[in-house]
Amino acid sequence: MPTDTLGLAVANPVPRKRRLPGDRQRWAAGASVLALALLWWAATRFGWVDVLFLPAPEQLFEALQRLWQEGYLDASLLQHVGTSLLRVLLALGAAVLTAIPLGVLMGLNPLAGAALDPLVEFYRPIPPLAYLPLIVIWFGIGELSKVLLIYLALFAPLLIATAAGVRRVDRSRVQAVRCLGASRWQVVRYVILPSALPEVLTGLRIALGVGWSTLVAAELIAANRGLGFMVQSAAQFLATDVVVVGILLIAAIALAFELGLRWVQRRFAAWG
C-alpha cells in the first residue's frame, strides 16, 4: 500500500457506532421483565401452578377492567388509589418537614446527634406491625393512626441519611463562606443543604420504599378504602386476581415515585 494512502487511512478512520452503557442497561431491564412475564404465562398456561394461587395474565386484565368499572366494596378503584396516595403523601410531607431539619441539626451539632441517635436507632429496627397495637391504643382507629404508622417508617431513614450527608460536607467550604461574612442560616441554605442533597434524596428514596411497604400494615387499622385494604379484604375471599392487581398497582405507583426521584437526583444533584 502506498505511504500516502496508508496515512489517509490512519488519519480518517471509519467511525464505528458504539452502543452506550445506558442502552445496554435498558435492554437488560426489558429482557428481565419479558423473561418474568413469559415464565408467568407459561406457568399458568401449562398448569405448573394452579390459577387459584397465581392467576393468568389475562385474568388480571379482566380483574383490572372489572375493578375500574365496578369498583370494590362500595368504592371505585380511583378512590382506593387516591386514599392510599393521600396517606403516603401526608406521611411523606410530615417526614420531610421534621426529619430533614433534625438531620441537619444532628449533622451540625454533635451533642444533638448524641442525644437523638439512640432514640432513632432504638425504634428503627422495630417492624411497624410490632408497635401498631400501641398506636391504635394511643391514637384510635382514625386516619391519624394510619398516617402516623407510615410516617414513623419514613422518618428514620430520611433522618439518618440527612445527618450523614451534612457530616460529609467539606468543612473548608463552610469556613470559606463564613470568612466572607455569611450568617449561619446562609451557610446552611447555600452550602450545607446543596452539598448534602444527594444523600438526602437517596434517603428519601429508601424511606419511600419502606413507606409503601408499610401501607398495607397501616390499612389494617379499621380501613374501608385503600389499596392495602383492598388486598387484605380480597385475600380473605381468596380473590387472588384482585390481590395481585392491588399488589401490582402499589408496585407501579412506588416505581413511579422512585423514577421521579431518580430524575430529580440526576437533574439537581448530579454531583453526588
Where are these regions (language model features)?
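Generic hydrophobic transmembrane alpha-helix motif, especially the helices
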Residues: 121-157, 164-165
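Transmembrane alpha-helical segments of polytopic membrane transport and secretion proteins
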Residues: 1-34, 259-272
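Alpha-helical membrane-protein architecture signal
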Residues: 61, 74, 78, 82, ...
